[in-house]
Amino acid sequence: MASEQNIQTFRDFLTQYNLVAEQCFTSCVNEFGSRTVNAKEESCANNCLDKFLKMTQRVSQRFQEHQILNAQANGAAM
């Protein structure tokens, strides 16, 4: 049971990782004339990932706050 949950968690992580990588690549890499990443593309990709991580952290924080409020409301109702 725990192993299945770990596998699903890892699959979810990989799916999310691939979506972020694709989105940041599509948004940031526009020139394919060189084999190297230029400074503008690197900066864009770093900013893209940073924004995603901050957004994920903020959503997680809000979800926890919501869960706490629900638990308090359910405790007060009893």
From Swiss-Prot:
Keyword Zinc attributed: yes
Disulfide bonds: C24-C48, C28-C44
Molecular-function annotations in GO: metal ion binding
Superkingdom of the organism of origin: Eukaryota
Keywords tagged on the record: Chaperone, Disulfide bond, Membrane, Metal-binding, Mitochondrion, Mitochondrion inner membrane, Protein transport, Translocation, Transport, Zinc
GO cellular component: mitochondrial inner membrane
Bilayer disposition of the protein: Peripheral membrane protein
Twin CX3C motif, short sequence motif: residues: 24-48
GO terms (BP aspect): protein insertion into mitochondrial inner membrane; regulation of multicellular organism growth
Record localization: Mitochondrion inner membrane
Domain remarks in the Swiss-Prot or TrEMBL record: The twin CX3C motif contains 4 conserved Cys residues that form 2 disulfide bonds in the mitochondrial intermembrane space. However, during the transit of tim-9/tin-9.1 from cytoplasm into mitochondrion, the Cys residues probably coordinate zinc, thereby preventing folding and allowing its transfer across mitochondrial outer membrane.
Record's function text: Mitochondrial intermembrane chaperone that participates in the import and insertion of multi-pass transmembrane proteins into the mitochondrial inner membrane. May also be required for the transfer of beta-barrel precursors from the TOM complex to the sorting and assembly machinery (SAM complex) of the outer membrane. Acts as a chaperone-like protein that protects the hydrophobic precursors from aggregation and guide them through the mitochondrial intermembrane space.
Description of how the protein assembles with itself and partners: Heterohexamer; composed of 3 copies of tim-9/tin-9.1 and 3 copies of tim-10/tin-10, named soluble 70 kDa complex. The complex associates with the tim-22 component of the TIM22 complex. Interacts with multi-pass transmembrane proteins in transit.
UniProt family annotation: Belongs to the small Tim family.
Protein name: Mitochondrial import inner membrane translocase subunit Tim9
Name of the encoding gene: tin-9.1
